[in-house]
Amino acid sequence: MSKTTGGDSESKNTLYCSFCGKSQHEVRKLIAGPTVFICDECVELCMDIIREENKSSLVKSKEGVPSPQEIFNVLNDYVIGQAHAKRVLAVAVHNHYKRLNHASQNSDVELAKSNILLIGPTGCGKTLLAQTLARILDVPFTMADATTLTEAGYVGEDVENIVLKLLQAADYNVERAQRGIVYIDEIDKISRKSDNPSITRDVSGEGVQQALLKIMEGTVASVPPQGGRKHPQQEFLQVDTTNILFVVGGAFAGLDKVISQRGQGSSIGFGADVREPDARRTGEILREVEPDDLLRFGLIPEFVGRLPVIATLEDLDIGALVQILTEPKNALVKQYQRLFEMEGVGLTFTEDALKAIANRAIARKTGARGLRSIMEGILLETMFDLPSLEGVEEIVVNGEVVDGNAKPLSIYAERKDDKREGA
């Protein structure tokens, strides 16, 4: 903006800051924008305000730490069941925030972090728990897949790429990234391939476990901002992983057999104690897991030692699967109902249909992950024909439709022409 005073020709061309009103002669620099100006002093003031806000978001006051109950309640909105695992995660995240506050107080006592291991059968909600945490946390969060990792120097992702993803989630703010949370999925896939030494290196198994040790415990990792080894001339960023919380999860297929065999002893001979095969559900058996079982499964002792908190997830029964289909905010039934609403058609699932879908998912042993593929198979033909159908008001799916013995019921709206003729 410009001002004029008393017809003075010099004042006609004088520019002023649109925020503080100082003239261009009173400040060092005046930056022009579309019809507005801002001086260097106002820019510095804005930067100071932003820095203070960043500090307050990085290190919250004690009253601002989300309580475990608050985190638990939010997880309940999206994840059905798994109360024990949700409590473990809620406490861990709450303590993570407290550790950040404690570190800022320069106390003599250093609080060590407690990395978490989630164990549960496929489709029970491990990944969904991590994804839901990402929605509610006020710290940078990233997910990684252990199956893509290899030792440094081999084709594949380096372990440092995990830190790079966290850095990207923090918009390359190193200070924020150093207080983030990392979730590594499919951690059971990097178990040692065999107990016998081999002349070939296990670059995607034990080698990855060895590489993960340091960043999980705490080290200064050199991270290439552009990733990979394609830009050897780039400057590396130094990220301290001491305050990064690591949550790792896996299905650990076969671990239940390792646990069941523990302590059974020999069953050979006349006086042997012959036992029946363990008939318990997988989730019940996994609840008894001990570090020695993980060692026999193929994790190295050093890696298990850096995961002091172990949470096991339960198998999902019919009731839980029906709840998953209907209750969460992003439930599958609600998603398909929304798709049908876009065509102006309602969609209804009867109670026996929901139970039949849950039974099929249990039979497939895919947990909640198999629900979507079952729903797609049931509704495929209906979704194909729906845009070309006229007058359909509602589609009803019952148990016979799920079992393949009938087609979905189409309810047609009464036409206005028919109503007029009747009148």
Swiss-Prot record:
Q: Name one GO cellular component term.
A: HslUV protease complex
- Which UniProt key words apply to this protein? ATP-binding, Chaperone, Metal-binding, Nucleotide-binding, Zinc
Using the record's annotation, list all stretches that form the ClpX-type ZB domain: 5-58
The record's Gene3D superfamilies line, in alphabetical order, gives: 1.10.8.60, ClpX chaperone, C4-type zinc finger domain (6.20.220.10), P-loop containing nucleotide triphosphate hydrolases (3.40.50.300)
Q: Which amino acid positions bind ATP, per UniProt? A: P121, T122, G123, C124, G125, K126, T127, L128
Which InterPro entries does this UniProt record tie to the protein?
A: AAA+_ATPase, ATP-dep_Clp_protease_ClpX, ATPase_AAA_core, Clp_ATPase_C, Clp_protease_ATP-bd_su_ClpX, ClpX_bact, P-loop_NTPase, Znf_CppX_C4
Question: Which family does this protein fall into?
Answer: Belongs to the ClpX chaperone family.
Q: How does it assemble?
A: Component of the ClpX-ClpP complex. Forms a hexameric ring that, in the presence of ATP, binds to fourteen ClpP subunits assembled into a disk-like structure with a central cavity, resembling the structure of eukaryotic proteasomes.
- This protein is called ATP-dependent Clp protease ATP-binding subunit ClpX
Instruction: List the source organism.
Output: Maricaulis maris (strain MCS10)
Q: Quick one: which gene encodes this?
A: clpX
